[in-house]
Regions:
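Protein/peptide-recognition domains central to ubiquitin and immune signaling
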Residues: 203-209, 224, 236
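Alpha-helical oligomerization interface recognition
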Residues: 20, 24-61, 76-78, 109-119
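Short functional micro-motifs and their immediate structural scaffolds
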Residues: 207-213, 227-231
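Short microdomains enriched in Cys/His and/or Lys/Arg
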Residues: 219-236
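Alpha-helical protein-protein interaction/assembly modules
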Residues: 53, 73, 86, 90-100, ...
Length: 236
């Protein structure tokens, strides 16, 4: 007997992934084309809904061109919107792949995929923090404007800091990703991310966490702007 109710509907929905049946939009990435359906993309993503149902090029041409991600990430994202699951079958590190899945979900505002990729990423980091691609995953996490995965990598790094500092890749990460370093140092001192005050640099407009006393000079971890009055630039 065929599955009934929601389970049966979701099972049937998978059959429309990259299918000609009722397809009314094409998603392209690096020369590859994926057949999709406007109603499915719009239901998952306000970003896609706006692009496909407004006075935009994507709406008139029935085509969405994604340029900032590898086709494997785009394919996995599309598979998810039809099945609510994705798997990494491309030989990429799980940490890196899941971080990129969260990144594309963040960019295109797909809440369900953000939740799923965060869950997978947390598991991957817990088991793979000692691997050489951990710094790569951290760098991807800090490319996003949202802090969604940052607590995961900061906690993992703080718990294993002695072993990580022996790795050249991690040391280079701390030099090239100052926001990660700015989050990690207070955490190592026993101050979790949520307890830190948030500041917005008036020079470069970047936000960062910290604990600044009144009087001494402190520097923005991004642009190195020196100030003694950071209390005037607290933000949320």
């Amino acid at each position: 007997m065929a599955p009934q109710g929601v389970e049966g509907f979701l099972e049937s929905l998978k059959e429309y992934h990259n299918s000609d049946a009722l397809s009314d939009v094409i998603v392209t990435c690096d020369g590859q084309e994926f057949k999709a359906h406007r109603v499915i993309l719009s239901a998952h993503s306000k970003c896609f809904a706006k692009a496909l149902n407004g006075d935009w090029k994507e709406s008139s041409e029935r085509r969405i061109d994604i340029k900032d991600f590898d086709p494997s990430i785009v394919e996995a994202m599309l598979r998810f919107v039809y099945s609510f699951e994705y798997t990494n079958t491309y030989g990429t590190s799980s940490m890196v792949f899941d971080a990129q899945m969260w990144q594309i979900a963040d960019k295109y505002d797909i809440p369900a995929l953000m939740a799923e990729s965060k869950k997978k990423f947390e598991i991957a980091v817990a088991t793979g923090w000692s691997m050489d691609d951990f710094p790569t995953a951290v760098a991807i996490v800090y490319e996003s404007a949202l802090p969604g995965l940052r607590d995961i990598v900061v906690v993992a790094a703080s718990k294993n800091i002695e072993k990580l500092l022996d790795k050249d890749g991690f040391s280079e990460l701390m030099r090239t990703t100052p926001h990660f370093t700015a989050d990690l140092i207070p955490f190592l001192c026993g101050k979790p991310l949520g307890s830190m005050k948030l500041y917005k640099c008036p020079s470069c407009q970047m936000r960062f966490g910290g604990e600044f006393s009144v009087g001494p000079t402190y520097y923005c971890p991004y642009c190195s702007q020196a100030r003694t009055n950071w209390s005037n630039y607290k933000t949320t």
